[in-house]
Amino acid sequence: MSEDTISAIATANGIGSIAIIRISGDRALEIASKITHKDNFTPRYASLSNIYDFHGELIDEAIVIYFKAPFSFTAEDVVEIQCHGGFIVAQSILKTTLLHGARLATAGEFSKRAFFNGRIDLSKAEAIAQLIEAKSEDAAKILAQQMKGSLKEYVEKIRDDLIHILAYSEVSIDYAEEDLPEDLVMQIQAKLKELKTSLNKTLQASKAREGLMQGFKVAIIGKPNVGKSSLLNALLNYNRAIVSDIAGTTRDTIEEQVKIGTHLIRIVDTAGIREASDEIERIGIERSLEAINESDIVIALFDASRVADYEDEQILSLIESKAGSKNVLHVKNKIDLEEKFYRSSLEFDIEINSKEGVEELILALENIMNQANTSDEMMLISQRQIGAVQNTLNYIDEAFEPLQEQELEIFSFNLNEAIKEIASITRPFENDEMLDKMFGSFCLGK
């Protein structure tokens, strides 16, 4: 990929026990020899070495490991220097490697070299980047599977099947006087339908399980002053939202994150739903309705101490119409007061101030999220991957009619485009701008 030898600090900035400086390229071993004053490094063996600056002054005592090409992350010669942590030592060693001829790596350049040198495919690169940023055990487990190559195997199987089908068409085009036999057309149609079913299952499962990756979005919905902000604070276990007896205190949506079990949830406290008294409140209520549409789970909160009125009925009807197949938890708050709100369909009774019933509500949320993690279907982890699968499906759909009409050149064109789209999940050779953008989001030492 490049004749440059690059260097960067691979660990996070800050105070710590250990920092790692990574060097990759043809001159990596030469630079390691210059900064250690040692000539012999056995590949993949840790060597305790003194590290010297450009003028021969001792910087630190460190562990130096040499990975000989192609048996390294980048498939180039790589040297990793494990020194004492902190700002000064690591920066001094990095500066010395640059003075000896290395270039400071750009963001994600080590991973980009690994990609272009065939050590990783693009799906694995995406998994690495997202694993570093993972905020829950759910996401980490999914990403670990993708790093092992599960998505790559799936993509290559789909691609190979499409190429196999395309071969029949290409042969018939070469012998233009001959149509595909009817029984072969039926076999191809059946195979394309089978591939469509597989891709649709993957697409649907990925969208349904998006909460495992991004965090499950939970919207708290209800009339003003039923305790939505208090419930948000109780779930977070600290006071995030202002709580007041004045109806309409929350005039906009508030979103916060919290872990429940192995899951990350994004809780949205919404403005109370009622007839708006001013423009600002109207906008807040509109955003509350948007929160229902965008959420994975809805908590519908009602005041047990008040008789159900027209607004309560409206909220129940609204949630039923907007929530669709989403999980909805109906909750009565203020059960310490005389109960006047009678609805047998409400599953949970809570008193937020004493936290009575809150633990049961949290367990119900956890159970819903656990159920989302039971699918064995392949998981797509980015909008780029989802878009590629959707485009593949579109081209397969476009191929059926020309196949039936024996318009084989059009059929072949659509199949070729489908092959390009599915292959782009692991190796999009022709989109340098997209690659630069993706690898540029990595940290410097990755």
Curated annotation (Swiss-Prot):
UniProt cross-references to NCBIfam families, sorted A to Z: mnmE_trmE_thdF, PRK05291.1-3, small_GTP
Coiled-coil segments on the chain, per record: none
Binding-site list for GTP: 225-230, 244-250, 269-272
Cofactor(s) this protein cannot do without: K(+)
Residues bound to (6S)-5-formyl-5,6,7,8-tetrahydrofolate: 22, 80, 119, 446
Name used for this protein in its record: tRNA modification GTPase MnmE
GO molecular function annotation: GTP binding; GTPase activity; metal ion binding
Role this protein plays: Exhibits a very high intrinsic GTPase hydrolysis rate. Involved in the addition of a carboxymethylaminomethyl (cmnm) group at the wobble position (U34) of certain tRNAs, forming tRNA-cmnm(5)s(2)U34.
